[in-house]
Amino acid sequence: MKKSVNLLSGGIDSATVLAIASEMCYEIHAMSFNYGQRNHAELQKVKELIKKYNVKQHKIVDIDLRAFGGSALTDDNIDIPHYHSINELPEIVPVTYVPARNTIFLSYALGFAEVIGAQDIFIGVHTSDSANYPDCRPEYIKSFEKMVNVATNMGIQGKKITIHAPLIDMTKEQIIRTGLKLGVDYKNTISCYTPTEDDLSCGNCLACIIRLDAFKKNNIQDPIKYV
């Protein structure tokens, strides 16, 4: 059985990608990160996901990205913006962008993949994010894949490492539709940047607005609870 390393955050996208990798019959090795983010609830949500998809092993890596901040998710001095509708969302890189986060995460996943001999790495980047987050674009994924195959022992031995981004051409609406077909229980996910201590989502941060809009377009009630 082929091995995969799946980046798993506890949100809609990574949960859907986990289901896709499971459907493709990979032996899944998941990796999550405690990087100093405001939303620690996402690390609790992954527990149910790894049970459902028979994840072989799950690594939670501690990284202190608060050490240099630069993002509303890792710096308490930067406020999380709140919105009333999807039409208010910014068309520029938002303050919730974490500098180089996907590059850092993929680098850890790459190291893990080399250790266990996995040639497939899965990440949940997609179209809806690519407009605002530079490390969610197709050209970024292609460039990273090219780099890893000249920078690793596996790569120079001809054991090509592939970075899979199966959601790359999908909107959030399409991602949810795909996940539902695969049986993903989105009750076990969270997207909110500032959930309460009892895991209630705020409903008006960028992530919540996009999530609620996507469920609405699918004519489905979001199964998680909001304030």
From Swiss-Prot:
Domain of life per record: Bacteria
Pfam family, one: QueC
Gene Ontology MF term list: ATP binding; ligase activity, forming carbon-nitrogen bonds; zinc ion binding
Reaction equation(s) it catalyzes: 7-carboxy-7-deazaguanine + NH4(+) + ATP = 7-cyano-7-deazaguanine + ADP + phosphate + H2O + H(+)
UniProt remark on cofactor binding: Binds 1 zinc ion per subunit.
Entry binding sites for Zn(2+): C192, C202, C205, C208
GO biological process annotation, one example: queuosine biosynthetic process
InterPro entries according to UniProt: QueC, Rossmann-like_a/b/a_fold
Coiled coil regions in record: none
Keywords: ATP-binding, Ligase, Metal-binding, Nucleotide-binding, Queuosine biosynthesis, Zinc
Catalytic activity, EC: 6.3.4.20
Pathway annotation from the record: Purine metabolism; 7-cyano-7-deazaguanine biosynthesis
Cofactor(s) needed: Zn(2+)
Amino-acid biosynthesis as UniProt keyword: no
Chain positions recorded as ATP binding sites: L8, S9, G10, G11, I12, D13, S14, A15, T16, V17, L18
Protein family (similarity comment): Belongs to the QueC family.
PANTHER family per UniProt: 7-CYANO-7-DEAZAGUANINE SYNTHASE
Function: Catalyzes the ATP-dependent conversion of 7-carboxy-7-deazaguanine (CDG) to 7-cyano-7-deazaguanine (preQ(0)).
NCBIfam families: 7-cyano-7-deazaguanine synthase QueC
Name of this chain's protein: 7-cyano-7-deazaguanine synthase
